[in-house]
């Protein structure tokens, strides 16, 4: 049973469900369509005190692959908008990569922040 909603596991679950749903919309004659499902969950900067690190987990599923990425932020030197922008850039990078575009948008992470890829 899932115990943390802000986790790689939850992002993967979301991506898999989104992929399954996208398949249900596909007409059988459209077999060259590049389907994907994407999931993103995060605990990012807020105006109230919150324990734990600022982080986000993104997963993307296709018929042949499942990739997941975890972003860890410097919560003392980031605000919500800057974290949201980085997450958005990584989501765009994921979608672009699925479609064969490998020219990633730079995330401009701080020295003590990281992007970790799994799967």
Annotate the PLM regions:
Residues 1-105:
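Short alpha-helical segments enriched in small residues
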Residues 103-119:
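Non-catalytic propeptide/linker segments at domain boundaries
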């Amino acid at each position: 049973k899932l115990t943390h909603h802000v986790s790689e596991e939850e992002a993967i679950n979301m991506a898999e469900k989104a992929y399954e749903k996208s398949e249900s919309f596909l007409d059988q004659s459209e077999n060259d369509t590049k389907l994907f499902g994407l999931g993103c969950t995060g605990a990012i900067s807020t105006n109230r005190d919150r324990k734990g690190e600022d982080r986000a987990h993104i997963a993307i599923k296709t018929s042949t692959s499942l990739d997941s990425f975890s972003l860890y932020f410097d919560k003392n030197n980031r605000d919500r908008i800057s974290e949201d922008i980085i997450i958005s850039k990584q989501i765009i990078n994921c979608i672009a990569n699925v479609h064969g575009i490998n020219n990633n948008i730079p995330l401009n992470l701080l020295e003590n922040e990281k992007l970790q890829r799994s799967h």
